[in-house]
């Protein structure tokens, strides 16, 4: 598959040929279900778009029945930036409904399969974007990351996935799940392409009140820069043998490149999980209250307004979304607000402070992305099992840090990805370390 860097140098005529070839390949591999629609919009290098990012004139549904028929009346800021830089939206990728999930199984369009092994999950919630890039039916894609939704599917499918610092990329036009956690980012074939796409979409935006009003310099990855990289033995001991082997391999590769490896420790990640899910579900319960059948999307037949609200939301939302709305409403209720929500925010501040202290000693942290390689469909028996599998990714979102997942090893034909975590607004160092590691593993 042609890389993003190569595609950007092609004339218009060749780009149309590339689009036609991508469409043909996608139709031939339709059983993967990476795309929910092969829409096109404008001229330029084709970039696949997750189904929760607004593209003017496209049906954008967040993979939910409740938004079926909704046509986006505007472009998200990231889409405007793509168009301004010679790229064009191409294809809506599948996802977990409203980005709530880790397997891309909760979509109203059916599950997406992992191109590396179709009996296994592609990860989620940006599983369609990861699968499309891995299957060679997308040059690059945009995803969103609330608690690992770019990095985990990237690791499961063997591609590069980058979550920028919170506030670095505009959220204007991204359907909100957890407003203090969500961030749009690139999913690509290699680190260089991720840096190119990141440079295009990053920057302050007056239309997004959570956008950081600080200078955003383009990153130019420097693989020769020597860095202090923190490793976390107490984190890795609970991961599978395949993850531990890949972790050791990455450490050796980084040492060979001249980086200084420093052992660090982080607080027990069980606090990350509790703080994250209370925060994310509370924010989801308020953000999703707007989907009521009145203004847009699905509307159930009903005799009165109250019945319409009840039936629309009961029929329109899937089981996982309803579960999270209920839990979020519970932790925000008057009797439990202090006991759960306020306590979660205090824990979040402690988690952020801990990362800040660690970054006084190191430039980057090397961490697993998931406890194991991509698992088989049906392997996770309960929602709690699924939530616990996010243990390595959610702390990054709670602290608002940048991180990049890249393939490091293989286990029985399945990709093993690890992540490099950086200081807030220091994407340059994240890309420096990632390109150095990628080069060392070639």
Curated annotation (Swiss-Prot):
Query: GO molecular function, one example?
Result: glutaminyl-tRNA synthase (glutamine-hydrolyzing) activity
Catalytic-site annotation from UniProt: 50, 125, 149
Q: EC number(s) of the enzyme?
A: 6.3.5.7
* Gene Ontology CC annotations of this record: glutamyl-tRNA(Gln) amidotransferase complex
- Does the record carry Nucleotide-binding as a key word? yes
Q: Which SUPFAM superfamilies match?
A: Amidase signature (AS) enzymes
Which reactions are catalysed by this chain?
L-glutamyl-tRNA(Gln) + L-glutamine + ATP + H2O = L-glutaminyl-tRNA(Gln) + L-glutamate + ADP + phosphate + H(+)
Residue ranges the record marks as coiled coil: none
- Organism domain of life: Bacteria
- Alphabetically list the UniProt keywords: ATP-binding, Ligase, Nucleotide-binding, Protein biosynthesis
Record bears the keyword Nucleotide-binding: yes
**Biological processes, Gene Ontology terms:** translation
Write down the top EC class of this protein.
ligase
Q: Disulfide pairs? A: none
InterPro entries listed in its UniProt record? Amidase, Amidase_CS, Amidase_dom, AS_sf, GatA
Q: Which family does it belong to?
A: Belongs to the amidase family. GatA subfamily.
The record's section on PANTHER family has: GLUTAMYL-TRNA(GLN) AMIDOTRANSFERASE SUBUNIT A, TRANSAMIDASE
Task: Describe its function.
Answer: Allows the formation of correctly charged Gln-tRNA(Gln) through the transamidation of misacylated Glu-tRNA(Gln) in organisms which lack glutaminyl-tRNA synthetase. The reaction takes place in the presence of glutamine and ATP through an activated gamma-phospho-Glu-tRNA(Gln).
List the HAMAP family hit by this protein, alphabetically.
GatA (MF_00120)
User: Its quaternary structure?
Assistant: Heterotrimer of A, B and C subunits.
Write down what this protein is called. Glutamyl-tRNA(Gln) amidotransferase subunit A
Q: What is the lineage of its organism?
A: Bacteria, Pseudomonadati, Campylobacterota, Epsilonproteobacteria, Nautiliales
Q: What is the gene called?
A: gatA
